[in-house]
């Protein structure tokens, strides 16, 4: 029996982050590509949890392994929690994050620090080989910066300022990011849940 998790993503940066967080479980984290699964899933849910489950169910139909998926987004309070669940599709899926980030900075022009509050939200879904579904959610609070800073992250990381570290999530070391990241927190919650179902994987 292989202790494998197939994570429903093709994002190499995300897989690297997940592998680090899950390293102490002894389970091998594979991307869809590494598992030989190629599907295109329409994320049409109304919540992060629904979108994560849609992805996980689609991949689970192709394998007998434990499958996990996530959906995450950036919520900016001043912009009525935009881009929210549409974060990946904001301004179009093929639009670079440099353009997306600059657009959000431009929309917040003249807005003072105290009104630039924002959070990253992450929901993780897991589907066990027996079909049981689990979800976990976590957030990280911060605010939107005035320019992109940092090279360590991806997506909206360069504009998301974390007050407790005094820098953006793209400026954090991998260790620092895993301490506070929304995905890291959600994975820790999910890891605790999965301990109840040890052995229920491929």
Residue ranges and their predicted role:
Residues 2-6, 12-202:
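Anionic-ligand binding patches
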């Amino acid at each position: 029996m292989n202790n494998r998790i197939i994570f429903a993503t093709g994002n190499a940066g995300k897989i690297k982050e997940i592998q680090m967080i899950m390293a102490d479980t002894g389970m091998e984290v594979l991307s869809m590509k590494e598992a030989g699964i190629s599907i295109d899933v329409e994320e049409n849910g109304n919540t992060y949890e629904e979108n994560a489950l849609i992805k996980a169910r689609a991949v689970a139909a192709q394998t007998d392994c434990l499958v996990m998926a996530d959906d995450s987004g950036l919520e900016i309070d001043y912009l009525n929690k935009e881009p929210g669940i549409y974060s990946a599709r904001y301004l179009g899926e093929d639009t670079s994050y440099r353009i997306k980030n600059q657009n959000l900075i431009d929309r917040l022009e003249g807005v003072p620090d105290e009104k630039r509050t924002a959070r990253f939200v992450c929901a993780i879904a897991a589907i066990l080989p027996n079909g049981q579904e689990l979800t976990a959610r976590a957030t990280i609070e911060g605010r939107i910066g005035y320019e992109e800073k940092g090279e360590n992250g991806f997506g909206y990381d360069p504009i998301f300022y974390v007050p407790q570290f005094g820098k953006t999530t793209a400026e954090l070391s991998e260790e620092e990011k895993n301490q506070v990241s929304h995905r890291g927190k959600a994975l820790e919650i999910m890891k605790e849940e999965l301990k109840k179902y040890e052995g229920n994987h491929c």
